[in-house]
């Protein structure tokens, strides 16, 4: 999932620690609360994307949509029994959502078509639209889709880095979190090196430790800003 998404008039991000959606009107410099789920009527927030002028939110109770100018989330699809949606992403004017075991596609989020339920990737955890491709963070590594999610091809497989549980992209860099640490790629996930200067906050979510946002330690902010 992209940890920060950019809509035409604002940027949005999920705050997993406080179960809320935050908004920025100044190019990710400052953030305020867009939607706070104080009484948990929607459940635990899992994934967020911007699609056809609206926000789409995955929670443990289903998929919701809202206008991007006012937080009015309405249920468009209930959770799947026995195989819950864990993330959502907009790609080539279609919505894609993953359970741990399958990929689904929809135009508006209400009716989902199964696109892939193979075992080659292991469990799916996160989807990301990056540099014109749809990426997935999976139990076995990083995979890239073709033919609208029907096929998934290995981009990076390595047991040494651990299980990939979260992806985010900024500029030409990919950021990832595995169950062994934080990593960054400069060549669209073909090679990874440790990103030791990433710090939290983060929390347990979706089967692994989920990155809240990538940011640098103070001493390195002047040389490279990634927020």
Each model region followed by its residue ranges:
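Sequence/structural signature of beta-propeller modules
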Residues: 1-22, 212, 216-227
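Short coil-to-beta transitions that initiate beta-strands within beta-rich domains
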Residues: 1-8, 33-51, 74-92, 114-131, ...
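Entry beta-strands of beta-propeller and related beta-repeat scaffolds
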Residues: 7-13, 54-57, 94-97, 133-136, ...
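Loop/turn residues immediately N-terminal
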Residues: 18-22, 60-64, 100-104, 140-143, ...
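Conserved Ser/Thr-centered positions that define the repeating blades of beta-propeller domains
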Residues: 24-25, 66-67, 105-107, 145-146, ...
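Short coil turn/linker residues within repeat-based beta-strand modules
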Residues: 28-29, 70-71, 109-111, 149, ...
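Kelch-like beta-propeller repeat domains
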Residues: 67-74, 107, 173-175, 209-212, ...
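Tandem repeat domain/solenoid detector
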Residues: 75, 92-94, 101, 114, ...
């Amino acid at each position: 999932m992209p940890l920060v998404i950019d809509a035409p008039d604002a940027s949005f991000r999920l705050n997993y620690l406080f179960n809320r959606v935050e908004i920025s009107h100044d190019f990710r410099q400052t953030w305020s609360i867009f939607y706070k789920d104080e009484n948990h009527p929607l459940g635990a927030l899992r994934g967020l994307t911007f699609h056809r002028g609206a926000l789409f939110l995955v929670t443990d109770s289903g998929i919701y949509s809202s206008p991007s100018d006012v937080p009015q989330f309405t249920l468009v699809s209930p959770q799947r029994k026995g195989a819950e949606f864990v993330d959502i992403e907009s790609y080539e004017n279609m919505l894609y959502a993953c359970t741990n075991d399958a990929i689904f596609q929809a135009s508006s989020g209400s009716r989902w078509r199964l696109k892939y339920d193979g075992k080659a990737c292991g469990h799916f955890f996160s989807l990301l639209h990056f540099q014109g491709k749809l990426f997935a963070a999976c139990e076995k590594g990083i995979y890239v889709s073709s033919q609208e999610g029907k096929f998934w091809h290995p981009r990076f497989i390595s047991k040494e880095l651990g299980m990939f549980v979260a992806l985010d992209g900024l500029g030409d860099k990919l950021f990832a979190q595995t169950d062994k640490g934080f990593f960054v790629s400069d060549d669209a996930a073909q090679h990874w090196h440790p990103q030791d200067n990433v710090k939290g906050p983060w929390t347990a979510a979706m089967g692994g430790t989920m990155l809240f946002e990538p940011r640098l330690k103070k001493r390195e902010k002047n040389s490279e800003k990634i927020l």
